[in-house]
């Protein structure tokens, strides 16, 4: 029988980088086409976020050069604010590091893995470092970065500085990758950038394909999106560990001040209510009679906390005083049990929904600009819903765009999360299920699959509930599903009005031509019978036809608008 110390000889601590090196598929590096698209996605989203935060209209150039079979050089350059020299190894070489992962803020990337994951993929497929050229407006820094996977640290293996007489500012990334493939498929780089351009009409994007062909996705809006605002966590959306960890990191003077200043919808008055609820929870736990306990708990759930407290006689005032003292002590001295009681009270209390001013949708006009500029449809409409919350306290917002006809040849569902295209895992995404659940025939689309219709859905949130770390599919959350359906139906009603008018006009044109076809014969016959000039008779009937068609047009529009 082996001894315990022998069993643990192979025990080893694995770094985050080492874990993802062995499990690159979790980051989206699975399949030759998808892996290349993932690299471009990580670099481009970084560029867009950086430009928007700095108030710069993004200009992004992507170059893909074929070096051999399934071997490419990838270059992504932007006109963003640049990266300070000391942050280069952290940005490109350290996993779970970034400017947004620790903040409650809407962003395209959330995990602090993105671009460092791309650097690691390049490194494990070619063994070569990633070349980074960047400037914040001063001298240009050229650095070659590798990841030390054992330590989860970026290492600059070579660095050169250059003068910058023209004041260039931005970042250029160059990396070699193998085991990838460039194709113009629905999951490839070209399609990804096309979809990115639709959702980001303020961006100018260039793509140089491996055959040297230059593709330009022009800017169709000069409006820079307002940067998202960091949002405080809502009491209904936190766990015990959140409260405990935040309290121990807080610099506030008391637990009360910590709760009021670092959570949304908690005021001084709410603290008084919280004290009562925590006291009531404690007293309920001391109640021996299960039947009485259940009745009192029912009252507490219904918000009658004062009645619950009074039912314990004189004891309740002492318990309230004890809890009030907890609120006055330093937050770093908050115990786990006390944090549990606070979160349990949060679940019973009623709060206003979290503020949603920090969410930044694309906007209806910009969706229409993006769809029109790239797809050239004959009709386009968009709907941005009011913000809502899921999981009790996480704000989100849904917007939808529909583009019909024109240069569109078939149906397409364009899925986005915080403006980022989701190209993979469509079958497990709530957007797909919501679009498929719509009865499109009600909106004059006989067959969704064969209709010249593009459906854009963008889900915005500080915490998009992805189904995996690959961030390509949104979980089937009931509140999100319902909001997508409502937005789709709203937009589809506008499309139905347009199609109704289009079909009606086609019918009226055909009808007019049929009637006009017989006018010469009618005019001749009436001329013989009445002696009136043929031209006068023809003009009379033309006016009569036009008048009749106009009346029918107005009546049909009124009926359709009432039905919509």
UniProtKB/Swiss-Prot annotation:
Q: Does the keyword Glycoprotein apply?
A: no
Q: Which GO terms describe its molecular function?
A: ATP binding; DNA binding; DNA topoisomerase type II (double strand cut, ATP-hydrolyzing) activity
EC annotation from Swiss-Prot or TrEMBL: 5.6.2.2
**UniProt KW Nucleotide-binding keyword:** yes
> Which Gene3D superfamilies would you find in this protein's record?
1.10.8.50, 3.30.230.10, Histidine kinase-like ATPase, C-terminal domain
User: What is the protein's name according to its record?
Assistant: Type 2 DNA topoisomerase 6 subunit B
On the tree of life, the source organism's domain of life is Archaea
Q: Please name the taxonomic classification of the source.
A: Archaea, Methanobacteriati, Methanobacteriota, Thermococci, Thermococcales
Reactions catalysed according to its record: ATP-dependent breakage, passage and rejoining of double-stranded DNA
InterPro entries to which the protein is assigned, alphabetical: HATPase_C_sf, Ribosomal_Su5_D2-typ_SF, Ribsml_uS5_D2-typ_fold_subgr, TopoVI_B, TopoVI_B_transducer
